[in-house]
Amino acid sequence: MSHKLLAFPRLNYISNFNFFYKNTTKNLILDQNFIGNLYLTSTPTCRKLVTIPSNRNIMTTSSNLKESDSGSILENVATKVLNCQEPEAKSSQKIDTDKVSSNKVESTHIPFKVVPKELNKSSSATATSSSKTKTNLRSIIQPYVKLTKPNLTILVTLSSICSYAISPYTVSLPELLFLTMGTALCSGAANAINMGREPEFDKKMPRTVGRPVVRGLISPKQAYQFAGITGSLGCTMLFLGVNPTVSFLGFLNIVLYSWIYTSLKRKSIINTWVGAIVGAIPPLMGWAASSPLDHPGAWCLAGLLYAWQFPHFNALSHNIADQYKGAGYVMTAAENPKLNARVALRYSLLMFPLCFGLSYFGITDWVFQFDSAIANSWLTYLAYKFWMQIKQNYTGQKPTANGIAMANIHAKKLFWGSVWHLPAVLILAMLHKKGQWDRLLIYSGLKSHDHKSQSSNNIGLI
């Protein structure tokens, strides 16, 4: 039990600490405080009490032992105060009230009152119940958050937001908020259905064995119910807050990912191409929120996300190809490693003309070609190294252990290169959006507004 030490007003001033010494009986009869004005007003310092031997003979009687015990109690208390210990500190220097009473030391003889610090039972019960409520609420919400695959949902939502920002027409903040929330809800619904359909397969892979449906935290039925609620909310928000086209694309993405792609994963390697279409729809959603889909720039952005899926996923699936095969999934990395690496290189090269199309159709300025070429060249180089190693491993002989290890290393480099590549290209496209810097200079007053050139730019964008 912790104690709160409350100091009584002192009665007299004592210039020394003789009553601490064990060769005197003053410690039981003094009614004065042992601390003077000097020690109450100055900064406390740690003092080590040294016993000064007396010339008188000390009789080892029972009364002297009792006096010694009582003196040690007060000495321990005083030492604790002088050492500035916290009330909650666990120490051997505690006041044993039972021992004090047994030695007939009255509380008035102690220079300060000892008040036990006890928690109110009602407040303690309230704090305990609130902590349990928070824990229970977290244990309920967390599995549903994991059910949405938050990392993938964030990536899908960001690709939609970036496309909305790159589109040539003005940006509306309420429209952007509805687009963000609706896209995230639709993506979460698709992922929830995907997890609800594959617990028997996911439990066979170390990568997916920790998913909430596999662990039994959520049943497949609950996953479907959650997907129905979030999907309905997402499509409704997109329909009312953005436009019907975006709402339809969100619903189409749920169907493609959760039913068609998920079913094809166990039947054919074509599932990778279908999954790439799923990744290309969010940029179309962002573009359609402010601009018509008949503009070629929309399809250049969608093509960019479509092509990016292959070096990203093919590199990821290469290192876990055996896990996919053991779980019953049909993936290109497990069925045909050479095709897997070749497709990754092929679509890395496709990034160059797609970025060129953004400048050609007036979405970005021509400086974007030089900036994006650096990122595209790096990704293509990593894909080329990966393809060359796979080609060497499967040319006329069984791959060696060193060759397999090198292929795994190049696959990891390509995967992390793709993780950095996509944000870099999208950010560069937003920075080099057509007329972006002119609008900034006009807004800051560094450039005069040219209505004629502005109207011609708008006509060219339409």
Swiss-Prot record:
Its main location: mitochondrion. One of its GO terms (cellular component) is mitochondrial membrane. It holds the Pfam family UbiA. The keyword Transmembrane helix applies. InterPro entries: Protohaem_IX_farnesylTrfase (IPR006369), Protohaem_IX_farnesylTrfase_mt (IPR016315), UbiA_prenyltransferase (IPR000537), UbiA_prenylTrfase_CS (IPR030470), UbiA_sf (IPR044878). One of its GO terms (biological process) is heme A biosynthetic process. It comes from the Eukaryota. Its EC number is 2.5.1.-. It is a multi-pass membrane protein. PROSITE patterns: UBIA (PS00943). It is found in: Mitochondrion membrane. The chain crosses the membrane at residues 152-172, 173-193, 237-257, 269-289, 296-316, 348-368, 411-431. GO terms for molecular function: protoheme IX farnesyltransferase activity. Keywords: Heme biosynthesis, Membrane, Mitochondrion, Transferase, Transit peptide, Transmembrane, Transmembrane helix. PANTHER family: PROTOHEME IX FARNESYLTRANSFERASE, MITOCHONDRIAL (PTHR43448:SF2). Converts protoheme IX and farnesyl diphosphate to heme O. Belongs to the UbiA prenyltransferase family. This is Protoheme IX farnesyltransferase, mitochondrial.
